[in-house]
């Protein structure tokens, strides 16, 4: 299988308006079209400060992350090697890449270089709609579930791109 089938899907939930307030990390590493690594971690956002609107979206509360590690710990232990110099996919990559950059800056971490891909730009529909259409299980606004759905969508896209072409103008 092509190296195109090697990528990392990510999703973050945030505690408040600040993009550096990641409170849950979802990461799915795909190699050769198969899941080889998963991360589903609650992380304590800076000051463990939450806004009610964010809680209403994902259901994560300050008590849930009170004893959770900081993002920097999760980054080094579970994420960095799957992001740096890799293809990174998200459903709305602009949001997730922005959160990653702001959160790493908060911790004075070096910014990774990676190639961005966006399933929202590819499919032009919301994650809930697409998950239903393609029969992908989804617990929407759970970072792990959203990252897994994104990974499955990107695999669908790659398989379509790599499908043998039938018919020819010259037949």
Regions found by a protein language model. Name each.
Residues 1-3, 151-171:
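Acidic two-metal-ion nuclease catalytic site recognized across multiple nuclease folds
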Residues 2-97, 101-106, 113, 127-141:
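Conserved non-catalytic scaffold segment of RNase H-like nuclease domains
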Residues 10, 117, 145:
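Active-site flanking residues adjacent to catalytic metal/cofactor-binding acidic residues
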Residues 84, 106, 125, 156-163:
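A structural signal for alpha-helix termini and helix-coil/disorder junctions
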Residues 97-98, 117, 148-151:
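Non-catalytic, well-ordered alpha-helical scaffold segments
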Residues 110-123:
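Conserved beta-strand -> loop -> alpha-helix junction used to position metal-binding or nucleic-acid-contacting
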Residues 125-159:
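Metal-dependent de-N-acetylase/amidase catalytic core
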């Amino acid at each position: 299988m092509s190296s195109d089938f090697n990528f990392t899907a990510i999703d973050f939930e945030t505690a408040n308006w600040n993009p550096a307030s990641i409170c849950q990390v979802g990461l799915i590493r795909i190699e050769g079209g198969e899941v080889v690594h998963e991360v589903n971690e609650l992380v304590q956002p800076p000051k463990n400060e939450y806004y009610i609107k964010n809680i209403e979206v994902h259901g994560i509360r300050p008590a849930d992350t009170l004893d959770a590690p900081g993002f920097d710990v999760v980054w080094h232990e579970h994420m960095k090697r799957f992001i740096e110099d890799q293809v990174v996919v998200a459903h709305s990559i602009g949001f997730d890449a922005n959160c990653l950059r702001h959160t790493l800056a908060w911790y004075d971490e070096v910014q990774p270089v990676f190639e961005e891909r966006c399933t929202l730009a590819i499919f032009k529909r919301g994650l809930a709609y697409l998950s239903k259409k393609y029969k992908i299980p989804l617990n929407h606004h759970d970072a792990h579930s959203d990252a897994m759905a994104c990974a499955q969508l990107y695999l669908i896209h790659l398989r379509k791109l790599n499908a043998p072409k039938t018919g020819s103008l010259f037949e």
